[in-house]
Amino acid sequence: MDKQWLVNKTNPEYISYFAKKNSVSAILAQILINRGLKTPEEVRSFLKPDRTQMSDPFDLPDMQKAVQRIRTASERGETVLVHGDYDADGLTATTIVVKALKMLGIGCDFFIPNRMAHGYGFTRASVREAKRRGASLIITVDCGITSFEAVSQSKREGIDVIITDHHEPKKIQLSAPEGTPTKTEQIQQQEFTLPAAFAVVNPKILIHSPAVNLSGAGVALKLAQALFIDRGSEDIMSHFLDLAALGTIADVVPLTGENRMIVKEGLDMIGHGTNTGLLALKRVAGIKGKYLKPGKLLFSVIPRINAPGRISDAHSVINLLSTDSEDEAMNIALWLDQQNSERQRIEETVYQEALTVLEQKGITPFIVLSAEGWHKGVIGIVASRIAETFSRPVIILSVEGDTARGSARSIPSLDIYYALSACRDCLSRFGGHKQAAGLELRSKDIPFFEDSLNRVVVDLLSDQDFTPALHIDSHIDLCNVSFRLLKEFEMLEPFGTGNPEPLLGSKSLEVVDARIVGNGHLKMKLKQKKNVIDAIGFDLASYMATLESSYKIDAVFTPFINEWNGSRHLSLNLKALRPSTEN
């Protein structure tokens, strides 16, 4: 699919001023400006994140109440149940809170819902489980912010609930779905309606919180930090940053602000191997070396952590992340590897079936696909793949009798949580973020729901919004692609959502020795005046015809250092190319 080429442009005089003020190159200055940085203090914090930049955990709403209630539970010897979620963010968040409580001598147990048996989130089934275990206090992590019924049931059972979550709260101005408790059972804070829990700790309740983009594991880290401060100890990050980094990367939250520090320091901890379970998982995933990047974890360790929660039971992941036994860790890691292979098989089957349904229905502004028997554990991944392929928001629904449960994935131009909110009369329940959500509705309502979503999207988006865009950070001549520049780019790491790897563009390039290699990849040399550099375009073999019919090309790329047999040379990772506009 062709993409829009959008070049960020700034007044050259301001770039020169900014570069001099911050002692960086003009290209890095342009990138930092693109990232929204304005002052030397902001630049310094971005390039050199450290723990001093962490905000006070007690600035989060209800944190003081939460800590006091946990302290009371400890003093009374109450049974505390930590209720997590079955994805990597929820599992790492659960491990953080359980580990913190045990380090403080507070007895606790944990519960991870089974996707098939219990469904998603904090539910009535969760309350029944807490009652069975004799818990008088439930701490939710990475879930609970829209669990009105479960919180109300907990109160009736005499069980207090502390919610720690980072998902979107329910907005007051939206009409309430059937089954939502009355206003007397709810608490209103700012523009949101919250469950009537003992405490609700969620940075999204605050409009201007510096912690607003924390993952579930990030919020759990804040709770752990607050608990230790309450006990007179503040330096506890070394116990939890590796887990918090994993959860942050897994949930694809912006790697800016506090998340940047969490991931940067956490990656270093993961790389140097202090967690027995993660060491085993790295070995099974084939990860070597101490220098890790988020992308490597996203495609190796994290899918294995996610796998059991998708197709079976995720409790063993907590054991893996908590154990000091190398034998136990390796046994669990090998089992996770098997689970991931099975997940891949199931996912591919559902993906191919979904493509068949899409071919029969045709592409609409908002793609909604449904069928009986699709495995609920993989429909989120399938939705992501179809959304990326067709540049459309996508919902994949698994139908079981009268009920359909699904996962939604969006494109950058659409807030999918807003779109679902506009159609909430069709839904039994839903929750999530701007780019991803989960939902449930009656099977018979699917056609009307699909029609409603498409009307919403047509009103909100233009044709251009459905065309994926390449946001080019800066134009560059090949003579300026250097080892020194790439060394400077290292200061921008870690890369991820909100801080992508720098994307550069160059014009009027001669193509030398272009050929297709491997499974649909494009390899060549690019020449500009006297400068020649190797280039590789993964999955870009379809551009071969463009190269053969063009005298010169324009290219978008990320530069990198190719290391092979002890040698290092500069190369370009091509993202797109076109006939040159300067021919």
Model-derived features with residue positions:
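Hydrophobic helix-and-loop "lid/oligomerization" segment in the mid-to-C-terminal part
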Residues: 2, 8-137, 157-158, 173-178, ...
